[in-house]
Each structure stands twice: as C-alpha cells, then as structure tokens.
UniProtKB/Swiss-Prot annotation:
Presence of keyword Cell wall biogenesis/degradation: no
TM annotation in the entry: 7-25
Protein task: Major early protein present in virus factories. The presence of BEN domains suggests a possible role in organization of viral DNA during replication or transcription. Plays an essential role in the inhibition of the cGAS-dependent type I IFN induction in host dendritic cells. Mechanistically, abolishes cGAMP production by triggering host CGAS degradation via a proteasome-dependent mechanism.
Pfam families named among the record's database cross-references: BEN
GO molecular function, one term: DNA binding
Induction: Expressed in the early phase of the viral replicative cycle.
Protein's GO biological process: symbiont-mediated suppression of host innate immune response
Statement: the UniProt record of this protein carries the keyword Mitochondrion: no
Assembly and binders: Interacts with host CGAS; this interaction inhibits CGAS-mediated type I interferon response.
Gene: OPG067
Protein family (similarity comment): Belongs to the orthopoxvirus OPG067 family.
Protein name: Protein OPG067
Domain BEN: 112-222, 233-328
C-alpha cells in the first residue's frame, strides 16, 4: 500500500490540477462548444479594423507628444550653455561701457539703434524694480508683448510648466537674459539656480492668477490638429506643423505674415500697408498672391465656416499691420509702472 507523505500529497495535487487544466483547455477547443462562451471574444473582434485605426491614431498622437517633449528638453539643455555664454558677454559689455558710452561703440554693434533702445529700456525697468518676481513678470511683458495681446495666448505659457503638453514654455533664450538682469539687480551677478527656480514658480503663480481673468475668444481658437485638412496631403502636413507651434489663430496669422512680408517688417515699411488699397487714408494694398497663401493656411484651422473664416482672417491681417505686437518696446511705461507699484 502506497504511503502518502507530504511530498507525495503535494505532487498528487499538482498532477490533478494540471490534468484538470488540460481537460478544460481541450474542452474549450472543442467545435461543439456553445457559441455563448465566445461572446466576449466576439465583442472585441467585431470592430477589429476600427480598433486598429484608433490604436494607430493613439500611437501617432503619443509619438508626436513624445517628440514635442524631447525637442523642448533639448532646447532647455542648449539654453543652459547659452546662459553661460550670454552672461560672460553681458558682463564684458557692462565693463566696456564703464570706460566709454553706448554712442561711441554703437557703430560697431549690429542693429545699433535697436540694441541701444533694448539696453536702455531693460535698464530702466531694472532700476525701477524692487522685487525679483515683479521684475521678471515686467520683463516678460516687455519681451513677449505678442503673448499679452487681445487673444490672451499667455494663458498657455509658463516659465516652469508642470505639463509640457498642456502649457508652452517661454523662449529659454530670452529667459536667460531676464535671469542675468535679475541676478545683476538683486544678487550681485551671482549665479543663483535654486533662487531662479523659486522666482519662476512665483511668476507662474502670477500668470495663473492673471489667466483666471481671461479666456481665449472663439474667434481665436484653432481646430484640433486631426481635423485640419488642406488642399493636398503635402499642404495638410505643412499646415499642421505650423499649427503645432501656435496657441491661437492670431498667432498663426502672425507667423505666416512675418514669413511672407519679412522685408516690410524689417524695414518698417509695414506701416504704409493694409489688406486692401485705401487711397483716402494713404494705405497700399498687400500682394494678393501672398494674401491667398495666408487664407489657404489659416482658414482650414479655424473652427468656423469658410466665409466667416475669410472675414476673420482679413480682420486679423489688418490688425497686425496696424500694430505688430512682435516689435518690442511699445509698452515700456506699462512695464515700469508695474514694477513701481
């Protein structure tokens, strides 16, 4: 008679379990089995093609987001090297003007008038500042005036965003200059990385509080990227790539105008131009071919019917030529008043 030890008992249990498992598996493969047992399986196989398309869309969306975050991180790393180089250059520049004047060295500086005005303006903001966080906020207003326009696109910007998908980051290269100015004004030119991080967090809180007062108006909203379609696949891809960089339709219009009419903005001749000829007011009409390109890019991205989109697009073009907000220095007094409060 077989004596069942503990080991034998355990082995017997395992054998019986395996036998039962194999029996169940073999029954599940039997063609006579009731179809009801496959209800769940059939449920998820009915729309297999549709499921594949959805998975592909999710995969592409994830890849695009991953690419975006990678590019942002790469820009931040490059900006760190830029900060160190810019700070050395700034300190040398300040030493230079101790023994001479800006007027004397201006001829050797590219775009000397713009450089002179920039340095003069940011110096005035710095001298009036009593608080590092308010100084940073005022310099953001000064250096990014287009973000604080009627479309309120600043709502989507942060210095240190919690989510790099939900919020955009201000240009790290301009932030480097702001950081250098703050370190000069309050920290005797010492590099204060931790302090800068704290200041950035405080400024983000100020941006959040200001953002709560506004919303992006419907006329400035953009279609979801997957709903944008151009005249061809190539056009669609190009338009989507431009839209990925924008928060509002006004920003998209500005980007296209700065590309197509670069010379007018660079020379300052833009002041004499509008969408249509206006002889009474002395305005010259813009190139029709280039305006058609603006419409072809912008209209598919607006969540309204094409006739309405065309009218809104024309309004935004005229608005930008009346007051191109990318040109800094127009709001100097506003910035000084802000830091003086």
């Amino acid at each position: 008679m077989l004596i069942l030890t503990k080991v034998n008992i355990y082995m017997l249990i395992i054998v019986l379990w395996l036998y039962g498992h194999n029996f169940i598996m073999s029954e599940s493969q039997c063609p006579m089995i009731n179809d009801d047992s496959f209800t769940l399986k059939r449920k998820y196989q009915i729309d297999s093609a549709e499921s594949t398309i959805k998975m592909d869309k999710k995969r592409i969306k994830f890849q695009n987001r991953a690419k975006m975050v990678k590019e942002i991180n790469q820009t931040i790393r490059v900006a760190q090297t830029h900060y160190e180089t810019l700070k050395l250059g700034y300190i040398k520049f300040k030493r230079m003007i101790r023994t001479t004047t800006l007027e004397d060295i201006a001829p050797s500086i590219p775009n000397n008038q713009k450089t002179y005005k920039l340095f003069s303006d940011i110096s005035a903001i710095g001298k009036a500042s009593q608080n590092p966080s308010k100084m940073v906020y005022a310099l953001l207003l000064y250096m990014f005036p287009n973000l604080f326009g009627d479309d309120h696109r600043f709502i989507r910007y942060r210095m240190h965003p919690m989510s790099k998908i939900k919020h955009k980051i201000f240009s790290p290269f301009k932030l480097n200059l702001i950081r250098i100015l703050v370190e000069e004004r309050f920290y005797n030119n010492e590099c204060r990385s931790n302090k800068w991080r704290i200041i950035g967090t405080q400024v983000d809180k100020m941006l959040i509080a200001e953002s709560d007062k506004y919303t992006i108006d419907a006329r400035y909203r953009l279609r979801p990227i997957y709903r944008i379609k151009g005249k061809s696949e190539e056009d669609t891809l190009f338009i989507k790539q431009m839209v990925e960089q924008c928060v509002t339709s006004q920003e998209l219009v500005e980007k296209v105008l700065k590309i197509l009419f670069r010379d007018l903005f660079k020379s300052g001749e833009y002041k004499a131009y509008r969408y249509d000829d206006d002889v009474e007011n002395g305005f010259i009409g813009l190139d029709t071919l280039k305006l058609n390109i603006v419409h072809d890019i912008v209209e598919p991205c607006m969540p309204v019917r094409r006739p309405v989109a065309k009218i809104l697009c024309k309004e935004m073009v005229n608005k930008y030529f009346e007051n191109p907000l990318h040109i800094i220095g127009k709001n100097l007094q506003e910035c000084i008043d802000f830091v003086s409060e």
